[in-house]
Curated annotation (Swiss-Prot):
Gene3D superfamilies: P-loop containing nucleotide triphosphate hydrolases. One of its GO terms (cellular component) is cytoplasm. Residues 195-197 form a propeptide. The gene is RHO1. One of its GO terms (molecular function) is GTPase activity. GTP binds at residues 13-20, 60-64, 118-121. This is Rac-like GTP-binding protein RHO1. It is found in: Cytoplasm; Membrane. The modification Cysteine methyl ester is found at C194. A motif (Effector region) lies at residues 35-43. The lineage of its organism: Eukaryota, Viridiplantae, Streptophyta, Embryophyta, Tracheophyta. PANTHER family: RHO FAMILY GTPASE.
Length: 197
């Protein structure tokens, strides 16, 4: 058996979008019911990919403004980011491009990002929207549009509560590291030049 490859995967996104629940749901198949804001936490999972073992180091971060100076310390050495927003929070969706992409580009340029829409189970929950009249759901099309805007190789919608697509999120993160998407090479100006003979 070959030595396992280590992948550092860091979750980022606004507070209360479900980053910790996503990690706990993935690593223990349980859904925590109490909300306790994260300062910093670490999880680990061994995953077999194409017959090889991958040790997936999962770093949980605090989305709250209070931790803006502390949070980037976890970015060093990251192989991939899971950038999460809530499918029932327009503010968290808007902060992907307003706050998180600038932060990641500044502290970890070139590291791939998997965009994740969380709380999928609540998007079609009529009772939730009756109880929260100001909430606006984010559509799959809006998520895809945001993925293209930020240049993320993957966009996945999931529910930590029902486990729907939870494994797919981390499979995508591993795949992005092990099989990076081919980037289109831009032609240099010399190649674009027209020659008149």
């Amino acid at each position: 058996m070959s030595a396992s490859r280590f992948i550092k995967c860091v979750t980022v996104g606004d507070g209360a979008v479900g980053k910790t629940c996503l990690l706990i749901s993935y690593t223990s198949n349980t859904f925590p019911t109490d909300y306790v804001p994260t300062v910093f936490d670490n999880f680990s999972a061994n995953v077999v990919v194409n017959g090889a073992t991958v040790n997936l180091g999962l770093w949980d971060t605090a989305g709250q403004e209070d931790y803006n100076r502390l949070r980037p310390l976890s970015y060093r050495g990251a192989d991939v980011f899971i950038l999460a927003f809530s499918l029932i929070s327009k503010a968290s969706y808007e902060n992907v491009s307003k706050k998180w992409i600038p932060e990641l580009k500044h502290y970890a340029p070139g590291v791939p990002i998997v965009l994740v829409g969380t709380k999928l189970d609540l998007r079609d929950d009529k009772q939730f929207f009756i109880d929260h009249p100001g909430a606006v759901p984010i559509t799959t099309a809006q998520g895809e549009e945001l993925r293209k805007l930020i240049g993320a190789p993957a966009y996945i919608e999931c529910s930590s509560k029902t486990q729907q697509n939870v494994k797919a999120v981390f499979d995508a993160a591993i795949k992005v590291v092990l099989q990076p998407p081919k980037t289109k090479k831009k032609k240099s100006k010399a190649q674009k030049a027209c020659s008149i003979l």
